Amino acid sequence: MDSYVIQTNVNDSLPSVLDVRVNIGGRSSVQGRAKGRKARWNVRPSDMSNKTFNPIRAIVDNMKVKPNPNKTVISLSIGDPTVFGNLPTDPEVTQAMKDALDSGKYNGYAPSIGYLSSREEVASYYHCPEAPLEAKDVILTSGCSQAIELCLAVLANPGQNILIPRPGFSLYRTLAESMGIEVKLYNLLPEKSWEIDLKQLESLIDEKTACLVVNNPSNPCGSVFSKRHLQKILAVAERQCVPILADEIYGDMVFSDCKYEPMATLSTNVPILSCGGLAKRWLVPGWRLGWILIHDRRDIFGNEIRDGLVKLSQRILGPCTIVQGALKSILQRTPQEFYQDTLSFLKSNADLCYGALSAIPGLQPVRPSGAMYLMVGIEMEHFPEFENDVEFTERLIAEQSVHCLPATCFEYPNFFRVVITVPEVMMLEACSRIQEFCEQHYHCAEGSQEECDK
């Protein structure tokens, strides 16, 4: 039997040269001399970690400003509905979790894409004649964020590009660029309730475009696209043969004066990966259960995209099994009154905030129709001491102890985002402080003195 022997000088602890001797057919010969590795510590971060950049963290962490010690801090910046304790999930939801835990059935590993029974429940919950679903069309994930990550990873290669909204959720860029995927920004129009500039969107598409990301209802805008507008978006995607990643984590979280339309119900020709989860509608973001719904009635994705999602899901071996065990009861037993009460509160707060901020000179809020947010334009010409929205919001913290996210975090300068999940009394106080702040810093723009005198 042939043998391979590497001979070293045992007297040298760190040899610089190795003799490689090969014994073939009983004959020994020196095949070559290999250079050894000079041992030294050289641990460096990976390219992926160096490419990973979260605009919100980069901006907020550099806002080294202390709030006014004489005023209680009011945070309108955190998109977590549980922070203030005024929006608990329904008792049926927590009981479902307790029952799943007490059963002892869900302490082990599940398939990486989730239990079959849990995927069947999600498919049944979202199935409709216009967009039929089966368990094989559902991938369970660790929150909606991981659902988005898997969709980007399965659709795009390094060097390709994706189209994302401006303003838009910063995670899209963070994930894409860490994978070497280029990001192209399409514009949302505040004067049209944040509808997409469709002409500009289509101009961005080229042979390297891997997918179009559509977030509806929107974070940070609180906008909800009409059926007609969604059909126009789908027409662009169909014309250009670009699949859609639909971020629908706020699906059904729309106010009573408008209707939510899942994108997949409006097209049989465009393949759509819809991302959702429990976080927002059920008010449990920390439970980290999301899903991908695969809508592909023309079999454009074929088996390859489905298989790719399964393979990618195996990197973390699936989401929390206890939440999966509770999923059937959560989806079947949560009363409609819970959803209605949540939306009633959000709409009331949105109306209150919009009305109060609309009356403040220098601010231009855009009325929301759903989700948990409201965007406010700053007429910077009336606040000349501030260079941009970041400085404006920094001073708002320092003087009034009110935290709002500058919309530069969402690629949209000279706006700021307000979270409308805070208790009503806190919202009233925050709006009052914002008014006081603006009145103290407002200056008439050149040529508008007559308006200021009114």
UniProtKB/Swiss-Prot annotation:
Catalysed reactions, semicolon-separated: L-tyrosine + 2-oxoglutarate = 3-(4-hydroxyphenyl)pyruvate + L-glutamate
GO molecular function: amino acid binding; identical protein binding; L-tyrosine-2-oxoglutarate transaminase activity; pyridoxal phosphate binding
N6-(pyridoxal phosphate)lysine sites (modified residues): 280
Protein keywords: Acetylation, Aminotransferase, Phenylalanine catabolism, Phosphoprotein, Pyridoxal phosphate, Transferase, Tyrosine catabolism
Disulfide bonds: none
Functional pathway: Amino-acid degradation; L-phenylalanine degradation; acetoacetate and fumarate from L-phenylalanine: step 2/6
InterPro entries associated with the record: Aminotransferase_I/II_large, NHTrfase_class1_PyrdxlP-BS, PyrdxlP-dep_Trfase, PyrdxlP-dep_Trfase_major, PyrdxlP-dep_Trfase_small, Tyr_aminoTrfase_ubiquitination, TyrNic_aminoTrfase, Tyrosine_aminoTrfase
Membrane-traversing stretches: none
A GO CC term attached to the entry: mitochondrion
Listed EC numbers: 2.6.1.5
Cofactors demanded by this protein: pyridoxal 5'-phosphate
Modified residues (N-acetylmethionine): 1
Keyword Transferase: yes
Domain of life where this protein originates: Eukaryota
Sites of Phosphoserine modification: 448
Top EC class, one word: transferase
Temperature dependence: Optimum temperature is 55-70 degrees Celsius.
Pfam family, one: TAT_ubiq
The keyword Transferase appears for this protein: yes
pH dependence: Optimum pH is 7.
Signal peptide as annotated in the record: none
Any single GO BP term: 2-oxoglutarate metabolic process
Role of this protein: Transaminase involved in tyrosine breakdown. Converts tyrosine to p-hydroxyphenylpyruvate. Can catalyze the reverse reaction, using glutamic acid, with 2-oxoglutarate as cosubstrate (in vitro). Has much lower affinity and transaminase activity for phenylalanine.
Complex and partners: Homodimer.
Family (UniProt): Belongs to the class-I pyridoxal-phosphate-dependent aminotransferase family.
Protein name: Tyrosine aminotransferase
